[in-house]
C-alpha cells in the first residue's frame, strides 16, 4: 500500500519531535484561528500535504503521549480529512476530466470546507500548550523496527476496511438495479475512489459531476472515516459527532458551490 512508507516515516519523525518545529512557526497562526494548542495545529498542517487517514495516525500519536484531550482529538478529526493532492489534481483533475484546474478547485474547496469546520468547532476556552517532549532514549534501529510494526498493523486495518466496503459496493452493483446517478452518490458515501470514478462515468453535465465530487471529497466516505475510527479504537472518540458534522458541512459546501455556479 502507498500509505505504508508514509506511516513508518511519520512515526519515526514524530518520535524525534519533528512536529515541534511546525508548532513553533506557522502552527502559531493556525492555533489562533481554531483556538487550539500549537501542537494540535501541527496535525492540520501535516494533513494538508499528506492524505487521510494520516490525521488519525497523528492524533493517535498525540493521544498516546497525553499531548491533546479526547475532545480536541474528536474536533481535529472533523477538519483534518484532506484527500491526497496528487489524487485530486492528478487522478481526478487530469486523468478523469482532463483539467488540472478541475482538481485544483476541488482541493481548494476541501481546504475551505475544513477551515470552516475548524472555525465552527473553535474552542471557547483558552488552550495552554503543554511542555511534554518525548524522550528519545531508544536507538535508531529500535525506532525503525517499532515504526515498521506499527506501519504493518495500520496498513492491515486500512486494507481490511477497504476490502469490506468494496465488497459491499460490488454486491450492490450485482444484485440491485440502481440509477447510475444515485449509484455514484451512494458509492462515494461508502468508498471515495469508487464513487469519484462512477460519477465521472455518468452521462451528465460537467457542473453536476463537479458538485457530486465536491460532496464526496468533503464527506471523505465511510470507508475512510471508519479507517480512522479503527486506528483510534482504544479511545472514546465521538463518532456520532464526526459523522454529523462531516455530512452537514459537505451538504453546505456542495449547495454553496451550486449557488455560485448559478451566478
Language-model features, listed with the residues they occupy:
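Alpha-helical transmembrane segments of polytopic integral membrane proteins
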Residues: 2, 6-10, 19, 55-56, ...
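Alpha-helical membrane segments and immediately flanking helix-loop junctions
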Residues: 33-97, 186-232
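C-terminal transmembrane helix pair
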Residues: 85-90, 110-115, 207-263
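Selected transmembrane alpha-helices and immediately adjacent juxtamembrane segments
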Residues: 1-12, 104-182, 251, 255, ...
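Transmembrane helix-loop junctions in multi-pass membrane proteins
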Residues: 13-19, 90-92, 168-179, 197-207, ...
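Hydrophobic alpha-helical segments of integral membrane proteins
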Residues: 18-34, 62, 136, 140-155, ...
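Small-residue-rich segments of transmembrane alpha-helices in multi-pass membrane proteins
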Residues: 1-3, 81-85, 137-139, 188-196, ...
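Membrane helical hairpin/interfacial module
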Residues: 1, 5-57
Amino acid at each position: 500500500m502507498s500509505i505504508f512508507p508514509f506511516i513508518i516515516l511519520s512515526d519515526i519523525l514524530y518520535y524525534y519531535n519533528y512536529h515541534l518545529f511546525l508548532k513553533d512557526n506557522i502552527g502559531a497562526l493556525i492555533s489562533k484561528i481554531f483556538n487550539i494548542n500549537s501542537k494540535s495545529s501541527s496535525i492540520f498542517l501535516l494533513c494538508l500535504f499528506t492524505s487521510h487517514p494520516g490525521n488519525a495516525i497523528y492524533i493517535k500519536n498525540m493521544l498516546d503521549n497525553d499531548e491533546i484531550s479526547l475532545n480536541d482529538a474528536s474536533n481535529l478529526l472533523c477538519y483534518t480529512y484532506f484527500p491526497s493532492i496528487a489524487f485530486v489534481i492528478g487522478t481526478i483533475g487530469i486523468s478523469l476530466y482532463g483539467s488540472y484546474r478541475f482538481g485544483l478547485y476541488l482541493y481548494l474547496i476541501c481546504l475551505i470546507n475544513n477551515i470552516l469546520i475548524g472555525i465552527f468547532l473553535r474552542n471557547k476556552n483558552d488552550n495552554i500548550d503543554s511542555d511534554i517532549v518525548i524522550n528519545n532514549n531508544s536507538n535508531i534501529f529500535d525506532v525503525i523496527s517499532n515504526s515498521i510494526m506499527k506501519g504493518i498493523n495500520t496498513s492491515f486495518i486500512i486494507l481490511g476496511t477497504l476490502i469490506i466496503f468494496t465488497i459491499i459496493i460490488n454486491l450492490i452493483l450485482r444484485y440491485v438495479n440502481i440509477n447510475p446517478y444515485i449509484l455514484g452518490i451512494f458509492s462515494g458515501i461508502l468508498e471515495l475512489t469508487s464513487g469519484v470514478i462512477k460519477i465521472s462515468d455518468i452521462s451528465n453535465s460537467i457542473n453536476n459531476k463537479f458538485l457530486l465530487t465536491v460532496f464526496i471529497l468533503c464527506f471523505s466516505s465511510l470507508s475512510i472515516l471508519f479507517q480512522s475510527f479503527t486506528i483510534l479504537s482504544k479511545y472514546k472518540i465521538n463518532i456520532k459527532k464526526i459523522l454529523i458534522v462531516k455530512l452537514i458541512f459537505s451538504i453546505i459546501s456542495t449547495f454553496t458551490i451550486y449557488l455560485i455556479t448559478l451566478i
